[in-house]
Amino acid sequence: MAPIGFCNSRKFLFMVIDQKILDDLTGLAKTNSRLRQAMDLRNSPEDGSQRLLNAMEPGTVMPIHRHHGSSETVVILRGRIRWIFYDENGNETESVVLDANGEYRMLCAERDRWHSLECLEGGTVIFECKNGAYHPLEADEVMEG
């Protein structure tokens, strides 16, 4: 498994994510100083969408941010997170707990909406997708503070 970089160096007809991939990614997240590890699921940098697995552990810090050019869809595969929305002043406006064994398992957030997340359970893995090719966040997409 290649947790960083592209899923495969050649075109593939289909991909299956199994328990071993989730376990390996979780193992890497536990030893990562940021307490999270992403796995890029695109075929190449030219792919027109962003698709990734993100394994995380409690204590990981996700800054309050937004995406100008994309909505964001998150599916919880394992564990639990609290997805938090904020207003322009950094005040929490609402939140939802996504739980792989609970009521809410998927969230679609509109573009330009300030948000963050809190990992509530060890071994958590989410699937994220966004529109367009990957671009690092711009300075005005990360809230100071």
Regions found by a protein language model. Give the residues of each.
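Glycine- and acidic-residue-biased ligand/ion/polar-headgroup-sensing regions
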Residues: 69-89
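Short glycine/proline-enriched turns and hinge-like loops at secondary-structure junctions
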Residues: 66-68, 75-76, 119-122
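A short, N-terminal "cap"/entry segment at the start of jelly-roll beta-barrel domains
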Residues: 2-49, 94-100
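Conserved short histidine dyad/triad with adjacent acidic residue
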Residues: 53-69
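Short acidic-glycine-tyrosine-enriched beta hairpin
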Residues: 88-112
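Double-stranded beta-helix
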Residues: 16-17, 21-26, 91, 96-97, ...
